[in-house]
């Protein structure tokens, strides 16, 4: 997964490659990744991109994504992180 930011305060842009068989993707975000309970689910995505808005500027955010098929849920991606502009 790749995270980018532009000059848009409070926004991050996530992009990932397709997962074979995935019909949608679960995306989770947190500011303290060592604690599993800190992750918050975002609205599922059906594409390989996601815009996360209304984030606190100057905070580091961590995201992960996984593919979801009709029969199963895949493993979480490696964590990606970025400081919010």
Where are the regions that the model predicts?
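A broad, structure-centric signal for solvent-exposed, well-ordered loop/edge residues
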Residues: 10, 26, 34-36, 59-62
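Pro/Thr/Ser/Gly-rich low-complexity, intrinsically disordered linker/stalk tracts
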Residues: 1-21, 57, 71-85
